[in-house]
C-alpha cells in the first residue's frame, strides 16, 4: 500500500498538514522528523506512521520508503557509535551520570538520498530528533535542502550501507550484538530512559 497518501491523511487528521497540501520530500522529512522519539510497537513503516512515533530505525525505514515513492532513491545506513559525556552534553543528569560511568554503545540509522538522480548526487539525511529538541541543545536538523548534507545524530565509529536485498533491521540487530556485546541490555535500558525523558520534556 502506498505510504504517501497514508502520511497525508494522518498528518491532516492531526492538524499538521493543510487539506490538499502536497507532500514533497521536504514535507515528508519534516513530518517524520517531528514524530516523537519513542519506540513504536514494531518498526514497520505502516506501524510507525499509524502510531506516529519511532526511534532512528523506524523513522528512517518509513522515510526511506516515502522518499522512494516521491522519486528519490534512498539507502539505509547503519553506524556504530557511543553515547559519551563529550558527544552528548545535552543528556539530563541521570543519563549523563550513566555515560560518565562508561560510554553506552549504540547503533544508529540514517539515510543517504539521491537528491539528483540525473547527476547521481547523494546527500545525508537524518530525521532522528524532532525540531523542538533544539531547545534541549540536541542536534536536530531543521531543513531538507537538496544537495546539503544534514548532521548525523551521533559521532559514527563505523558505517555500513544496507544492501537493497537485505533486511535492515536484521542487519542492525547483528551489528548491535557485535558492537554492544554484553552491554546490549544496558543499551536497551538507556534508549528507553532517553525516550521517556524526551516525552516528558517535549510532550507527544
Which functions belong to the PLM regions below?
Residues 30-31, 65, 69, 113:
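Residue-level signal for well-ordered alpha-helical scaffold segments within enzymatic catalytic domains
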Residues 25-28, 74, 79, 109, ...:
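Small-side-chain structural scaffolding
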Residues 1-2, 23, 71, 115-120:
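Solvent-exposed, well-ordered amphipathic alpha-helical segments
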Residues 15-20, 37, 81-204:
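His-Asp-centered catalytic microenvironments across diverse enzyme cores
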Residues 42-100:
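Active-site neighborhood of thiol-dependent amide/isopeptide-bond enzymes
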Residues 1-54:
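Secondary-structure boundary elements
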